[in-house]
Amino acid sequence: MKLTCVLVVLLLVLPFGDLIGVCSTPEGSCVHNGCICQNAPCCHPSGCNWVNVCPGFLWDRS
């Protein structure tokens, strides 16, 4: 039973791997306010997360 629970949790968490800083898609570009990304993930790999939001200090590099 415990193994089943662990497997279910892993299946739920794996699609959101970028929550822990794992970016699997190419860098995106941020809107110029430095917050919401136009493409996933955010403009800087350390800023990517599953809702495609950059912290305010990770500004658009362009």
UniProtKB/Swiss-Prot annotation:
Free-text tissue specificity from the UniProt record: Expressed by the venom duct.
Superkingdom to which the source organism belongs: Eukaryota
Principal location listed in the UniProt entry: secreted
Keyword flag Signal: yes
UniProt keyword terms in alphabetical order: Disulfide bond, Neurotoxin, Secreted, Signal, Toxin
Signal sequence interval, chain numbering: 1-19
Post-translational modification: Contains 4 disulfide bonds.
Compartments, as annotated in UniProt: Secreted
Stretches that traverse the bilayer: none
Record's function text: Probable neurotoxin.
Protein name: Conotoxin Cal12.2e
Organism: Californiconus californicus
Organism phylogeny: Eukaryota, Metazoa, Spiralia, Lophotrochozoa, Mollusca
